Amino acid sequence: VICTGATLPRDLPIEGRNFKGVHFAMEYLTATTKSLLGEGADSCPISAKDKDVVVIGGGDTGTDCVGSSIRQGCKSVVQLEIMPKLPMDRAADNPWPEWPKVYKMDYGQEEAAAKFGDDPRVYQTTVKKFVADATGAVKELVTVQIKWEKNDKGQFIPVEQAGTEKTIPAQLVLLAMGFLGPEQPLIKAFSVDTDPRSNIKADHGKFNTNVKGVFTAGDCRRGQSLVVWAINEGRG
């Protein structure tokens, strides 16, 4: 039974990506959890204590990064979101019983607002480059605002807005921009089929792959999701 998750993170290949202090979100969250379960928070190899933290990405993983940074005693935290801020009320094309696409604050943002006085999210913003200090560690990043516009094919694409560049201090940058699917070496080793999103192909409820005797469940089958879905499929 293959239950390896969908841990391949989306990267940000821009200038300065390899500076010290720029990490994938799961590197940070995993290290934080292991330190808390082991020797304690002070032993964490990636710590937000007394640092300006920038979280890039607005999903559940980004929220966890915001909350963990605050609990470690960060100096400040900013969460960059490439999408626009959602409306306070449902739009006409988002009726019940559809999932409400409205503005909300999750626990991470609420903790940030309680400590620093405001929602840490900055919307319709992307990162141009990272800037390092003399030791090669990240010290700040340069952002630019974007606007979503339709191209010739009718697809919405992000367009940078001239004159909106801004520098934000950051000694710790956490990349929480989603996941691209499960790690591929093990999948290839078992010769199982994958779907267009590179997840292992198997029907929900049966979980059998194209290879006899090989089954799969959880995020490596359905794609990156919440742990409750993995628990549900494990019980199934």
Can you describe what each PLM-predicted range is?
Residues G62-G67, Q72, A217-G236:
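A conserved FAD-binding loop/helix module that cradles the flavin
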Residues N18-D50, E149-Q224:
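FAD-site-proximal beta/loop scaffold in flavoenzymes
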Residues A48-G59:
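Beta1/beta-strand and adjacent pyrophosphate-binding region of the FAD-binding site
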Residues A41-C44, E110-P120, Q124-Q171:
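A structured beta-alpha segment of the ubiquitous adenosine-cofactor-binding alpha/beta core
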Residues L12-G16, V66-S68, P185-A189, V228-W229:
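Short amphipathic alpha-helical segments
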Residues G58, E81-K85, A132, D219:
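Cofactor-binding loop segments of dinucleotide-utilizing enzymes, especially the Rossmann-like FAD-
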Residues V66-K129:
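Rossmann-like dinucleotide-binding cores of NAD(P)H-dependent redox enzymes
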Residues V1-G5, V54-I56, V127, P169-G178:
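Short hydrophobic core segments
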